[in-house]
Amino acid sequence: MAAARVPLWAICVRRVALATVYFQEEFLDGERWRNRWVHSTNDSQFGHFRLSSGNFYGHKEKDKGLQTTQNSRFYAISARFKPFSNKGKTLIIQYTVKHEQKMDCGGGYIKLFPADVDQKNLNGKSQYYIMFGPDICGFDIKTVHVILHFKNQYHANKKSIRCKVDSFTHLYTLVLRPDLTYEVKIDGQSIESGSIEYDWQLTSLKKMEKASAEAEGWDQAAKDKSQDWEKHFLDASASKPSDWKGELDGDWQAAMLQKPPYQDGLKPEGIDKDVWLHQKMKNSYLTEYDLSEFENIGAVGLELWQVRSGTIFDNFLITDDEEYAENFGKATWGETKGPEKEMDAIQAKEEVKKAQEEDEDDMLMGRFRGRENSFKGFHRRNEF
């Protein structure tokens, strides 16, 4: 007896009890998405988004997402959710992106923002916690960005992670784990993983300079002759004679000896002092707030530039459960990726057929025009 198949949606429902889903967006309620997503008005020239499944798709409704609509524009849009901290938890960021226009230069990445981000004024200078996703420009840049904000600086992964460059929908997943390991997946397949400390070159941030520090006056010039440099110095070995009488002889002073051989411009002997090297100590800040932990995550958004528009963003997910993310990816992108390619193949065949028919028509017209010219030539020759 064959085992009964459990639908993917049922698996996802079961996982909800175990997973914390901070944000999930599939754009299945038509134009109501506008109540959740906020266009930035920071610049009147920002491009606009529309809800679309594109020219080819696996499912007309399920594949609808935010599509860029204007060429050579910056775009800025975001959605809020209940703020949370990923301290001590796994953080998964996942979404699909489709460069239907065959991207030549532009971003396809997303950003996670602090809860206090100003959505109406979102722009390229707005602070973000994480930037993740594909970026394409010409032949040189075809990369997956993974940028983390730490200690008021942005740190990029030092590894080169190649993105997909075709016009189909692809599933991008970033996993940040509390043991300071990470994983990047495309279409459910792991393409890069490793240590957050080493792959972001953050090991130096695990230690900080000790505040106590250099000897007093260390940074003052100590080599050159001082202004009070004298030719003579007191004889420290001299002692007052036993028959010295202060009442008659006055106050006794040690004899002054000449510094041999003194010349103007002579530099006194001393110890060369290099730059003071601070001792290194463990950065106590990191014990409370680690390299991939963010205290107040509260918004997700698209802030990017595109030369040629047409990209579609869909199936956004932010959660703490890797299995839930995997099942969600299968239930969304996994269900429509095949039909999408089938529709594209059908359209391609139709385009080829149409082009062939047009070529045949052109050839027939060309033959007729050729005969017409020959007839005219014949008549002209007859005239002679």
From Swiss-Prot:
Binding site residues for an alpha-D-glucoside: Y109, K111, Y128, D135, E303
Function recorded in the entry: During spermatogenesis, may act as a lectin-independent chaperone for specific client proteins such as ADAM3. CALR3 capacity for calcium-binding may be absent or much lower than that of CALR. Required for sperm fertility.
Glycosites: N42
Family: Belongs to the calreticulin family.
Signal sequence region: 1-19
InterPro entries linked: Calret/calnex, Calret/calnex_CS, Calreticulin, Calreticulin/calnexin_P_dom_sf, ConA-like_dom_sf
Stretches the record annotates as 3 X approximate repeats: 250-284
Region described as C-domain: spans on this chain: 295-384
Domains (record comment): Can be divided into a N-terminal globular domain, a proline-rich P-domain forming an elongated arm-like structure and a C-terminal acidic domain. The P-domain binds one molecule of calcium with high affinity, whereas the acidic C-domain binds multiple calcium ions with low affinity. The interaction with glycans occurs through a binding site in the globular lectin domain.
Domain of life: Eukaryota
Gene: CALR3
Record protein name field: Calreticulin-3
Residue ranges, annotated region (4 X approximate repeats): 191-246
Subcellular location: Endoplasmic reticulum lumen
Alphabetical keyword list: Chaperone, Differentiation, Disulfide bond, Endoplasmic reticulum, Glycoprotein, Lectin, Metal-binding, Repeat, Signal, Spermatogenesis, Zinc
Disulphide bonds in the chain: C105-C137
